[in-house]
Design a protein with these regions (language model features):
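Catalytic domains of carbohydrate-active enzymes, especially glycoside hydrolases
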Residues: 3, 28-58, 196-203, 270-278
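Acidic-and-aromatic substrate-binding clefts and catalytic sites of carbohydrate-active enzymes
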Residues: 16, 25-34, 42, 54-61, ...
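An active-site-proximal structural segment forming one wall of the substrate-binding cleft
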Residues: 38-41, 45, 73-89, 108-138, ...
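Substrate-binding cleft of secreted/luminal carbohydrate-active enzymes
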Residues: 49-51, 207-212, 233-314
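Active-site groove signature of glycoside hydrolases
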Residues: 98-105, 122-153, 278-279
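Aromatic- and acid-rich polysaccharide-binding/catalytic face
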Residues: 134-143, 147, 188-217, 283
């Protein structure tokens, strides 16, 4: 069997309105059964992980919370629907501890005491509501900042602070980050030292091919360098976050469409020798079975689903 994608990011609503053109309207009408069907579809492709990117967006929560009002969507508790179905499917779920500030300002969010306090309060509530689920595997910190040569001091402080909170309230849960700026990493001794002092279990670097910061032929060498650095640091496991999309027009300012599968196949092959796990961004909106009762995305998402399902049979 071909090396596949081990998991996927998962969103209740895409944060960038232009990018989510083809699936936000569908997601906004989803019932609990629609969310459950999406989890079953992901499980059918043998994926092991779901990363719920955001548990709040635009000052609204996707669960009953004292932090923000409940989002105005048909499903009153999509987090419960996802976790409960994941329990049945044997999928491991990471819950995002954002966005409890403006998602466009991660530099503010990781340094603002007010935003961090809100996220910690939400984490307490998420733990109280959902810790009984066997599928609740860990936490994802979505306020990512760009790696410029190495992780910034502010970002490292933020990650370690969040991880300390996770250890306190859910000592059995794992932690995940998925930084960008992967093509800018300088994996020298300073980078290795930073990795060694970063308290996180998994780092899923964005391959940045969909956003055109990295060309397909470059990603293998980048991940080879990162693997050597991670091995020397001896702490966080190296994962890959591969982008399954292309843009309809301008990068970041137009709709996301499913990428050509030949490109995605190369992306998988490039990182597979180095990454312990491969997470795709993302199943939601970019892949749909033809007969899905919970279709969300462009019609071309059917073809990407078909091609990927066939690839898994090789």
């Amino acid at each position: 069997m071909s090396r596949g994608i081990d998991g996927t990011f998962f969103e209740i609503h895409h944060h960038n309105t232009a990018e989510g053109k083809y699936w936000n309207p569908a997601l906004d009408s989803f019932t609990a059964e629609n969310w459950r069907e999406k989890v079953r579809e992901i499980a059918a492709l043998k994926m092991e992980y779901i990363v719920v990117m955001a548990t709040a967006l635009y000052d609204r929560c996707y669960f009953e919370s004292s932090v923000f009002p409940l989002a105005d969507i048909p499903c009153a508790d999509p987090i419960e629907a996802v976790l409960d179905e994941a329990d049945k499917c044997g999928i491991k779920v990471f819950l995002g501890n954002g966005f409890y500030g403006d998602w466009t300002k991660p530099g503010v969010n990781i340094t603002s005491g007010e935003v961090i306090d809100r996220s910690f309060k939400a984490m307490d509530e998420l733990t109280e509501k959902y810790a009984h689920h066997s599928s609740f595997y860990g936490w994802y910190f979505p306020d990512e900042t760009c790696i410029i040569l190495r992780f910034s001091g502010d970002f490292m402080k933020y990650v370690n602070l969040c991880s300390a909170r996770c250890h306190e309230i859910t000592p059995d849960k794992k932690t995940l980050i998925a930084p960008y700026g992967t093509n800018l990493t300088l994996t020298n001794s300073k980078y290795i030292d930073a990795l060694a002092s970063l308290d996180v279990d998994f780092i899923a670097y964005q391959d940045e091919i969909g956003v055109k910061k990295t060309r397909v032929w470059q990603s293998e060498r980048i991940f080879e360098r990162l693997k050597k650095a991670h091995d020397k640091a001896g702490r966080a496991a190296l994962w890959a976050d591969i982008e399954l999309f292309k843009f309809e027009g301008m990068v970041y300012k137009s709709a996301l469409l499913p990428a050509d599968f030949k490109r995605i196949e190369r992306q998988i092959a490039n990182v597979a020798p180095y990454a312990d796990k491969i997470i795709g961004y993302q199943y939601i909106g970019l892949m749909n079975p033809e007969d899905s009762g919970s279709f969300a995305g462009h019609e071309s998402s059917v073809e990407l689903y078909r091609q990927y399902a066939e690839y898994l049979k090789k």
